[in-house]
Amino acid sequence: MKRIIYSFVSACLLLSSCSMDEIPQASVDKDTVFRTEKGLETYSYSFYNMLPSVSDGFRQDAMCDYGAVTSFDNFIREGAYSAELSSGWSWSDLRNINYFIENCTNEAVDESVRNNYIGLARFFRAYFYYEMVVRFGDVPWIDRTLGVDDELLYAGRDSRTTVMDHVLEDLDFACENISRTKDETGSLVTKWVAYALKSRICLFEASFRKYHTELGLTDSVDEWYQEAVRAAETVMKESGHSIYTGEGTDASFRSLFISDKPVTSEVMLASCADAGLAVLGEANWWWTSGTYGARFSMIRTFVNTFLNCLLYTSPS
């Protein structure tokens, strides 16, 4: 009888033994990400890859007429550029954003926390579509993830009003729901950054509609200008940001650009370099090294532009 009992107990222990499955250390599933605030925060960092890099600020105007170059890009050569050679028609960032919004629904996370991160996602969706509209004009509006057989993969362009109205809705949601109001690093999107982007986008859209009368959208110009004004006033009155004057009129402007860290009293969102993280700027290499190859070189016109700026801003 005892043998039977021992055998039965042993069998129960074997059947109820611990699982050998381990939690992956290098990857997570969807439920793991979306059921905690930390998971939402970690996912949201992927959106920042859309923003300009450290080097974009001094490299993006390489073909402007303030500099001399040894060669020209095809996009300014007559007959050398075409739709096939164009860039920017990538939708992977949008899919990443829409996937997040669709799945940020787990009630284990407080609703206000979820809305904060959805607001952040919609901020970046507005930024994505702003960049697309500036580059291409009319584009299709897509606010969900698409399968491989989805008809929207072959969708035509939506009207400018449709797309930009959705962009404004995204910006309004972001301004209302992003909870962060201060960031000591100057590298994260805050509520005030959302208002600033809203002001910039609305100003662009109002001006575009005003001067492109062929669109037939001049009736909405004042509305978009007013949206820009209200957003800018919010930043000026409520954000706490202001022009940096901490080192006097002679040194503050220079200090703003040579500081190791963003001067967050003025700078709202920065692309940061950090030697400890091996993230370094390359401006000196770009401008002074012969090993970088053919590149933009300043001419007297640019130098005079800077000198005129100093003349107009000098307190004397």
Task: Show where each model-derived region lies.
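An aromatic- and glycine-enriched ligand-binding surface/loop that stacks and positions planar moieties
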Residues: 19-71, 172-173, 188-195, 200-314
